[in-house]
Design a protein with these regions (language model features):
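Conserved tyrosine-mediated DNA breakage-rejoining catalytic core shared by Y-recombinases
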Residues: 7, 185, 218-308
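N-terminal DNA-binding module of tyrosine recombinases/phage integrases
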Residues: 6-108, 304-318, 398, 413, ...
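Long, amphipathic, Lys/Arg-enriched alpha-helical "connector/arm" segment
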Residues: 127-129, 173-198, 207-210, 272, ...
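C-terminal catalytic core of tyrosine-transesterase DNA break-rejoin enzymes
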Residues: 156, 203, 207, 214, ...
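N-terminal DNA-binding recognition helix of tyrosine site-specific recombinases/integrases
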Residues: 1, 92, 103-108, 123-167, ...
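Flexible interdomain linker/hinge and immediately adjacent N-terminus
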Residues: 111-113, 156-190, 327
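Catalytic-site neighborhood detector that most strongly recognizes the C-terminal catalytic loop/helix
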Residues: 172, 180, 231-232, 243-245, ...
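Short, polar N-cap/turn motifs at the start of nucleic acid-interacting alpha helices
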Residues: 223-231, 236, 333, 352, ...
Length: 447
């Protein structure tokens, strides 16, 4: 328990505690007077008895976050998330609040920090095209989301008493919906597409709701298009890996991601990154996606062409068993497909969208076809939760909204108007055929 000590006319509350690193330490807390010391002593003892006592710590925010990254980040973040989150910490957290004591960082300090971020120069300004001069609201939102997660762990580890990053005042973020093609626009694009690789990629992305990294990592052992599969309407893909380009220094840092293979892509300049074939993102489990017969036949024909090329090239062909690859068997990167797609749009004067938007179009179209079956759509897209489908992919197309308005008019307002008309005509017929009732109504109206 705590005790009160008077030393040279000053009062101290003295107590022992187990520190964050497991060591037994003694703490002396100075008080202004004896009354304050009594109050402080009782407060500490009550917190200990109620098991809410927090061991005092001089740990800085930077020190805590480094522990957080080591214990939490390496186990829960994918390669891309790890790079992005550590970048946010190095650029916008450590320089501004890294030396602050974590236990004394209050909700007021949080709002002051956010306000300071809005006036902080963007590290990419002048480096990347169209980068804003100051930290954008979306970046601030990402920083706060990361710190909210960190403080949640700090609360769990009994480092702080509350999560000060909950309900903080964020700057307004203007959310822009991603432009997507309608099914009609996709049909038109496929009709005029002469690039065989791009043609197949568009079909796979739209019909199977694939991410571009999953699409390019698809291997023939996960494609089921044999005759018996067609007979049973069981043509399908298994999605269990993806292609990503990562920093070479990241390999071996994380324990969460399993890297199956690294590729040397023979770039002209020395590169700090490497293309890897790896497991799915965010603890993603392998998923089965059933494919339309037309797409299955496309794949069957594509495989025949690929086998013919293998025979011609012989040992020159680098067989990685990839469905989408260059003629020599080497993998195609997402930037290659994105550039092809962008050029295809420009040459044919099509509405500008990015390749990833085909996945959005796919989810939207499947939701419409299934009349809102979110779980079935989620099974194809591979999203972690159904809520992500409703938030990200349930775009409402204007044509459907007009149809809904027309249906509402016909089913609600028009029917009501007809009912009112019917009621009036029915009453008139009753009066015509009932002389006594008609005379009684005349007398009532004359009063």
């Amino acid at each position: 328990m705590a005790s009160i000590t008077n030393r040279k006319g000053k009062y101290y509350v003295v107590y022992w505690f187990d520190s964050f690193d497991g060591k037994r330490k003694q703490k002396w807390e100075q008080c202004e007077n004896y009354e304050e010391a009594i109050f402080k002593k009782k407060k500490i003892e009550d917190e200990v008895n109620n098991q809410v006592f927090l061991a005092p710590s001089n740990q800085t925010i930077r020190e805590f976050l480094e522990t957080f990254v080591e214990l939490y980040g390496t186990k829960h973040w994918g390669l891309n998330n790890y790079k992005a989150n550590t970048g946010l910490l190095n650029n916008y957290v450590y320089p501004l609040i890294g030396d602050k004591k974590i236990q004394s960082f209050s909700t007021l300090n949080v709002d002051q920090y956010i306000n300071k971020l809005t006036k902080t120069k963007n590290v990419n300004y002048g480096v990347r095209k169209n980068a804003p001069q100051y930290v954008s609201p979306n970046t601030i939102k990402s920083v706060v989301k990361l710190l909210r997660c960190a403080w949640r762990q700090a609360l769990r580890w009994e480092v702080v008493k509350k999560n000060v990053f909950i309900d903080c005042n964020l700057p307004y973020c203007e959310s822009k919906e991603r432009e997507i093609w309608t099914a009609t626009e996709i049909q038109h694009a496929l009709e005029i597409c002469e690039d065989q690789i791009l043609y197949l990629c568009i079909n796979l992305s739209f019909s199977c709701s694939l991410r571009i990294g999953e699409l390019l990592a698809l291997t023939w052992d996960n494609v089921f298009i044999e005759d018996e599969d067609f007979e049973k309407d069981n043509t399908r893909l298994i999605i269990d890996k993806q292609f990503v380009r990562i920093d070479k220094e990241m390999i071996g840092v994380l324990t969460k991601d399993e890297i199956y293979k690294q590729f040397d892509t023979q770039l002209k300049r020395e590169c700090k990154t490497v293309l890897v074939l790896k497991s799915l993102k965010m603890n993603g489990k392998a998923r089965t996606v059933w494919i339309p017969r037309t797409v299955a036949y496309m794949l069957k024909e594509w495989k025949k062409k690929q086998n013919d090329i293998k025979k011609k090239l012989g040992s020159i062909y680098d067989d990685n068993n990839l469905v989408i690859c260059f003629e020599d068997g080497n993998p195609i990167e997402k930037t290659n497909i994105e550039k092809r797609f962008k050029k295809f749009i420009k040459v044919n004067n099509l509405r500008e969208v990015v390749f990833h938007s085909l996945r959005h179009s796919s989810a939207t179209y499947k939701l419409k076809l299934s009349k809102g079956d979110i779980k079935a759509t989620q099974g194809d897209t591979g999203h972690k939760s159904a809520d992500m489908i409703t938030k990200r992919y349930a775009h409402i197309i204007d044509e459907d909204r007009k149809v809904n308005a027309t249906k509402f008019e016909d089913e609600f307002y028009a029917s009501k108007e007809n009912e009112e008309k019917d009621d009036g005509s029915e009453l008139l017929n009753i009066l015509k055929n009932n002389d006594a009732l008609r005379e009684q109504l005349k007398k009532m109206l004359s009063l």
